[in-house]
Amino acid sequence: MLLASALVFAAMVMPEAQAAVAVDVNASCTLNFQVETTTFDELDNISIPVNIYKVADIDVSGNYTAVDVFDDESLDLSSVSEGNAAEWEARAAAASVLAEGTEPTTTATITGGEAKVSNMNTGLYLVEAQDANSPYYTYSFSPYLISLPDNAYYKVDGATDDWIYNVTVGLKPEQTVRYGSLEIVKNLLVMNTIMGNDATFVFAVNVDEYPCDGTTDYTRYASVTYQELAAGAAETLVNNIPAGSTVTVSEVYTGSGYECLTGEQTQIIVADGEENAPVSVTFENTSDNTWNGGSGIENTFIADENGAFGDVDVTPSQKQN
């Protein structure tokens, strides 16, 4: 997961010796947030809640003293002039654990990629931008620590060691794909008892992954099986399809002794947890009064840890009416 900005860490590793100018501990500070939207332009249209916790007071020399729940041995602020980015990431993670269950000092909401918090007291702050969802992706942010005031001494060549009370930080998100499901409903109008008490119907699910270009990226198969036959509805759920993908579903095996009355159907996958999820398609079959035999198989497909689709998970249901 990417960190808020390398500049944030540089602001906090400034040795005491460089703080020739005293901190005005009574000054009012401003904290500005900017989200990188060049790579992920849909972030321009997403609101991102941010919780901000005061972790420590700062003295005139730039030293920090932890406050409240953050005054804990798990968070070492005694040597803030030392440590690389990884160590500051660990400090932020420790502060995030200590902040659990506590009320933030203040909050912000990033809209249009920007937010501004004014009239903040000086000190060291933990910033936690919350996960934000678009219809197709989740954007996550690592917690980080920021000093108010900040200092540009190590960030810009030739910069002075003046303290900066109007601070701007950039947020860089990690983007992960959201997944949705497809419900395939089989409505058996008339059962064919000639072929016994079981019937299996197989469906091809052609997936055009988001962003869609009108072509099939891969095809998966799912089945609905009736046991102890009774006319009515049964369904199966195909999981782990990228949200926003277009799926075209067709019945490729109509069951022994049955005919399909429904042509192929198309749906756009909605992310799990959203309104109208999961999307659904319905196929109707009726008996053709023949002795045609046959069988069906169901493949189970599961996405790997990198989001690649070797397979798509299928959850069958035996619900019948």
PLM feature spans:
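Solvent-exposed loop/turn and edge beta-strand elements of beta-rich ligand-binding domains
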Residues: 1-321
